[in-house]
Regions:
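Short, charge-rich amphipathic interface segments used for partner binding and complex assembly
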Residues: 26-55
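N-terminal acidic leader/helix
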Residues: 1-22
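Short intrinsically disordered terminal tails
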Residues: 1, 55-56
Length: 56
């Protein structure tokens, strides 16, 4: 994955987070937390990939 693909994945997860956060059920809150964790992992991947691309 390159940084553009990772950024698009982060944007998709943010959209899910916003949608699920607006809901009131426990399941929706769980999905929101899951999306937040995915964003965290993607951000780490973005930093690694960005550094690699800068070196190339």
């Amino acid at each position: 994955m390159n940084t553009t693909e990772i950024l698009n994945a982060i944007k998709a997860e943010v959209a899910i987070l916003e949608t699920e956060h607006a809901k009131t059920s426990k399941a929706a809150r769980g999905r929101a937390r899951s999306a937040a964790n995915s964003i965290k992992k993607l951000a780490a991947d973005f930093k690694k990939t960005s550094t690699t691309e800068d070196k190339a």
